[in-house]
Amino acid sequence: MSRTQIIDGRDENGNTDLMRAALNGQSGTVKALLLGGADVNARNHEGRTALMFAIVNLHTSTVQTLLDFGADVNVQASCGCTPLLLAAGSGDIGITRALLNSGADPETICRPGITALVVAIERGYSAIVELLKRPLAQAVQGKPKSFRSNLQSATRTAALAATK
């Protein structure tokens, strides 16, 4: 058995030691496992990664460590969720910003009609909404007017749904 196989050993749910350390915010353990060869992008049976576990529990320093080691910011779990969707849904602007700075795609559709922006609007996280709208506004420049109108309409619909 190789050293990597030992480090990336899995439990009955497909979780690795790296995922468990990320879930618990154990940044030192996360870094040691990564330096020892753990797969930063290993996925469990639900398609979740250590980065997703760290985000869900708002472990900012663990998130940054995983990003520093090349964690995939655009990976989608089996349910369709992405690290950015989880961060936007948590209301944590620091983690959301770190993901965007690392190349997370704010346009990824996680489930029909659901993006990180829609989740932030629905939950009333206005600072995250503004943060997510910036890259979208840049992407929309030069697109046909119909595309821009559809984006504006979707944003209004999500905002109205959030007020109900």
Predicted regions and their residues:
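Ankyrin repeat structural motif
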Residues: 26-34, 59-67, 92-100, 126-133
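Ankyrin-repeat helical core positions
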Residues: 1-2, 22, 34-35, 55, ...
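Ankyrin repeat A-helix N-terminal signature
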Residues: 20-25, 53-59, 86-92, 119-125
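Ankyrin-repeat-protein effector appendages
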Residues: 2-9, 102, 111-114, 119-164
